[in-house]
């Protein structure tokens, strides 16, 4: 990279920093951080643990953005100083180091830009992710377990905590359905990119003839909603069943009927939860999931009405095939919404989803 190219790159990044500063109200952010820290110093702060955690999460979100922006500014200034030194006197080692720093810096700016994109009302929330294999028995159920592992690996890489709210094992292998609660800042903002049907093409390990099979799993993603969301659920509209919780492999993991299946009769929505040993706690979690699904249904109906008014033929909800994972006759993962693809299918199955997620988020604001 010549000095002129380095200068051009730094001029581009300087403009991006200027744009970030223009879109971020840093003064208001400082004031809000101070207000939240004052709340945390209150002796009664932990009396309501749920409210306390909400304050902490909001504070952490602002601090992360504020500190990350200032770190970018400092790095920009440092690299501009290095460029001035190189203009005065050639230094191969310094130039090589600066080229390396610029590449890393561009990637960091890109990541920061993505975080700013996550500005929808519930992007910052935890995510509830459900996997539902399609028709095809063992083959599609095994594909479900492969996706389960993929999302667990991705969550680990992000530093997110994963709780398994419900697990229904497949008859021979894999899963019939799984519900995960993925906890972390912006978990829903990232994972909403995964909502839709995921298609697998491979030589089936369950087919003695070695034929190629196509399997489908539907992935549904919802934000975990706070209690202040007003959704009325009448007791007479509910059918509640209890049963023994089961783990992977189908074994009973509790001797009491602690697992809960809750059916909302008017909508037909069914939720299940078996993550807690207490039936009461499972009921509470199931009710939270039900309210989330009812809220999501309400929002999707509003979107559908708006789309009809605008004359848009937009499919809302799940049912659209969003991504293909091809193991045979070649290796490729392709997102059909953004056309982003990679041949490194194993890395994707090991949780390297960020490039797909980032491409989707950029496409929504592009």
Swiss-Prot record:
Record's comment on post-translational modification: Methylated by PrmC. Methylation increases the termination efficiency of RF2.
Q: What is its main location?
A: cytoplasm
Please share what else the UniProt entry notes about this protein.
The gene for this protein contains a UGA in-frame termination codon after Leu-24; a naturally occurring frameshift enables complete translation of RF-2. This provides a mechanism for the protein to regulate its own production.
Q: Which SMART domains match?
A: PCRF
**InterPro entries recorded for this chain?**
PCRF (IPR005139), Pep_chain_release_fac_I (IPR000352), Pep_chain_release_fac_I_sf (IPR045853), PrfB (IPR004374)
* Keywords in alphabetical order: Cytoplasm, Methylation, Protein biosynthesis
What is the annotated role of this protein in its UniProt record?
Peptide chain release factor 2 directs the termination of translation in response to the peptide chain termination codons UGA and UAA.
Species of origin:
Listeria innocua serovar 6a (strain ATCC BAA-680 / CLIP 11262)
Q: What is this protein called?
A: Peptide chain release factor 2
Q: Name one GO biological process term.
A: viral translational frameshifting
- As stated in the Swiss-Prot or TrEMBL entry, residues carrying the post-translational modification N5-methylglutamine are 251
User: Which GO molecular function entries does the Swiss-Prot or TrEMBL record give?
Assistant: translation release factor activity, codon specific
């Amino acid at each position: 990279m010549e000095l002129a190219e380095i200068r051009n790159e730094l001029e581009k990044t300087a403009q991006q920093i200027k744009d970030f500063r223009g879109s971020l109200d840093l003064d208001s952010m400082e004031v809000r951080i101070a207000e939240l820290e004052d709340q945390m110093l209150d002796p009664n702060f932990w009396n309501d643990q749920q409210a306390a955690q909400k304050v902490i999460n909001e504070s952490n979100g602002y601090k992360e953005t504020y500190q990350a922006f200032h770190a970018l500014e400092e790095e920009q200034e440092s690299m501009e100083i290095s460029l001035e030194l190189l203009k005065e006197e050639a230094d191969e080692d310094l130039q090589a180091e600066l080229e390396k720093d610029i590449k890393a810096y561009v990637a960091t700016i890109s990541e920061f830009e993505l975080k700013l994109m996550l500005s929808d009302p519930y992007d910052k929330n935890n995510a509830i992710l459900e996997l539902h294999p399609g028709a095809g028995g063992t083959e599609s159920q095994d594909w479900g377990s492969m996706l389960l592992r993929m999302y667990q690996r991705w969550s680990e890489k992000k530093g997110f905590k994963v709780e398994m709210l419900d697990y229904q094992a497949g008859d021979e292998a894999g899963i019939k359905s799984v519900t995960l609660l993925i906890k972390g800042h912006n978990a829903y903002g990232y994972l909403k990119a995964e909502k839709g049907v995921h298609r697998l093409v491979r030589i089936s390990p369950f087919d003695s003839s070695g034929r190629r099979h196509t399997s489908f799993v539907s992935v549904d993603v919802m934000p975990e909603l706070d209690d202040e969301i007003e959704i009325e659920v009448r007791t007479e509209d509910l059918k509640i069943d209890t049963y023994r919780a089961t783990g992977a492999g189908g074994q009973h993991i509790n001797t009491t009927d602690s697992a809960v299946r809750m059916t909302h009769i008017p909508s037909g929505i069914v939720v299940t939860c078996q993550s807690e040993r207490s039936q009461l706690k499972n009921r509470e979690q199931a009710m939270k999931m039900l309210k989330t699904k009812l809220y999501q249904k309400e929002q999707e109906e509003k979107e559908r009405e708006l789309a009809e008014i605008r004359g848009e033929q937009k499919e809302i909800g799940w049912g659209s095939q969003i991504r293909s994972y091809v193991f045979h006759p070649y290796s490729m993962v392709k997102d059909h919404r953004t056309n982003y693809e990679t041949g490194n299918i194993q890395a994707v199955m090991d949780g390297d989803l960020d490039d797909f997620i980032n491409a989707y988020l950029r496409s929504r604001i592009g």
